[in-house]
């Protein structure tokens, strides 16, 4: 179904408004449906960044980094399914080189404002976290804590390792201790996740948590780019709610424009709830 056909019910819900106002609202809703999220993924060498991305996301992947760019620039990859795009920024992990960490601090300060979310991968068997903690406090700081989702990766390597196809009770207990340790060290805004790509363990919960952590405008296109098993009811309903709330916020913003006459502002406020309901109803056609 074409976008203009999907927009028709929304247009009908705005029919009481002057044409230029309804067109402005529809234009912003259309832009919202084409929002391109940018997600950073960081972790030390061998943390499993690529395997996690491949496990979570579907779509065609194309590198977008300029080969002539500065070597300090992070690698960027663009994912596409249909009309939906997302960029993944591969950020270097800290704690492997003191000289590099100074460079990385500058890189992160430059990149953080542009990212919707950062997945910070910490290996289940990584005990050297002092540098990570320092970096989190000094570089990420209060301003961007809400953008960080900590993920314990390679949970199948938690002690005692067995190489089997399921996590043992002892491994799960040690993973729980690791989660508590990370909460204690970093005091993150969002709950810490734990996954094993090899065992396909914890990925659904992590995907749902990621959708909940994203800014409202970003959650729907990310859901559209998830592998099918992770497009769960929980993830989809969170994104649908976010989409409706964002459409409502668009109406609120337009109603505050200085050129909007008071009677038109009253109409916008009167139709807000019905427009949000329609937006939620047509979400499936967009995403």
UniProtKB/Swiss-Prot annotation:
Gene3D superfamilies membership: P-loop containing nucleotide triphosphate hydrolases
A Pfam family per the record: MMR_HSR1
InterPro entries membership: GTP-bd, P-loop_NTPase
Keyword GTP-binding attached: yes
GO molecular function terms listed in the Swiss-Prot or TrEMBL record: GTP binding
Disulfide bond residue pairs: none
Similarity comment: family membership: To E.coli YkfA and YeeP.
Species in which this protein is naturally found: Escherichia coli (strain K12)
Taxonomy of the source species: Bacteria, Pseudomonadati, Pseudomonadota, Gammaproteobacteria, Enterobacterales
Keyword field contains GTP-binding: yes
Keywords assigned by UniProt, alphabetized: GTP-binding, Nucleotide-binding
Protein name: Uncharacterized protein YfjP
One of the protein's GO biological processes: tRNA wobble uridine modification
Spans through the membrane: none
G domain residues: 48-140
Binding site for GTP: 43-50, 90-93, 156-159
């Amino acid at each position: 179904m074409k976008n203009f056909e999907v927009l028709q019910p929304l247009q009908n819900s705005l029919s009481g408004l002057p044409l230029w106002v309804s067109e402005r609202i529809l234009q912003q809703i259309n832009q919202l449906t084409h929002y391109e999220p940018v997600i950073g993924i960081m972790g030390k060498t061998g943390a499993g960044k690529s395997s996690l991305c491949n496990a979570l996301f579907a779509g065609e992947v194309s590198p977008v980094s300029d080969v002539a760019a500065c070597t300090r620039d992070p690698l960027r990859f663009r994912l596409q399914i249909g009309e939906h795009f997302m960029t993944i920024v591969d950020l270097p992990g800290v704690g492997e080189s003191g000289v590099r960490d100074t460079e990385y601090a500058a890189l992160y300060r430059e990149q953080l404002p542009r990212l919707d979310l950062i997945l910070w991968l910490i290996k289940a068997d990584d005990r050297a976290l002092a540098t990570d903690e320092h970096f989190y406090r000094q570089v990420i700081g209060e301003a961007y804590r809400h953008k960080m989702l900590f993920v314990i990766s390679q949970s199948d390597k938690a002690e005692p390792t067995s190489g089997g196809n399921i996590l043992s009770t002892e491994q799960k207990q040690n993973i729980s201790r690791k989660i508590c340790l990370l909460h204690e060290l970093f005091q993150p805004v969002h709950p810490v996740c734990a996954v094993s790509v090899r065992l396909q363990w914890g990925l659904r919960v992590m995907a749902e948590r990621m959708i909940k952590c994203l800014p409202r405008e970003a959650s729907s296109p990310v859901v559209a780019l998830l592998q099918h098993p992770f497009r769960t009811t929980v993830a989809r309903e969170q994104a649908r709610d976010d989409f409706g709330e964002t459409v409502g916020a668009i109406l609120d913003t337009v109603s505050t424009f200085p050129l909007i006459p008071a009677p038109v502002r009253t109409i916008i406020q009167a139709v807000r709830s019905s427009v949000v309901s329609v937006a939620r109803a047509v979400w499936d056609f967009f995403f």
